[in-house]
Amino acid sequence: MKKNLTNIYLIGLMGAGKTSVGSQLAKLTKRILYDSDKEIEKRTGADIAWIFEMEGEAGFRRREREMIEALCKLDNIILATGGGVVLDEKNRQQISETGVVIYLTASIDTQLKRIGQKGEMRRPLFIKNNSKEKLQQLNEIRKPLYQAMADLVYPTDDLNPRQLATQILVDIKQTYSDL
């Protein structure tokens, strides 16, 4: 089946640069950027931490699956996904079939620095006292799933979001001439 190339999906762990790069991709392509976690918060009127607290991870993942399904039906979007989106097989399938999947990677130290700068220590799966260990654990579980989905992979440790977004677009156009 031919891949639908109208959407660009950014996957990777928290702090990998998905939203920063996505914002630049949206500007360069004049497309709308969606952040799946922010869209869930808008729809529910509650933040992700509250959803995790009240509904548990299973409740959040159900909401995430519904949001991914809705967003994958849109055309010509940039989507910065939540780090755990790859844990659900249906999410992986929908994302893979409806766009180009960009996997952004970063070292654990870079992720910790970025998460700390954004004041995002409140993330539900981010345990402040064991943050480095938690990120390593999440990476071990999710990395094979990210790699299996990825059409293109980019390290973001030395991130200049605009330069990286420009390179991603060049690479997409070289790889997929009909985008």
Swiss-Prot record:
Binds 1 Mg(2+) ion per subunit. It comes from the Bacteria. Its cofactor is Mg(2+). It comes from Coxiella burnetii (strain RSA 493 / Nine Mile phase I). The gene is aroK. Disulfide bonds: none annotated. Belongs to the shikimate kinase family. This is Shikimate kinase. ATP binds at G15, A16, G17, K18, T19, S20, R123.
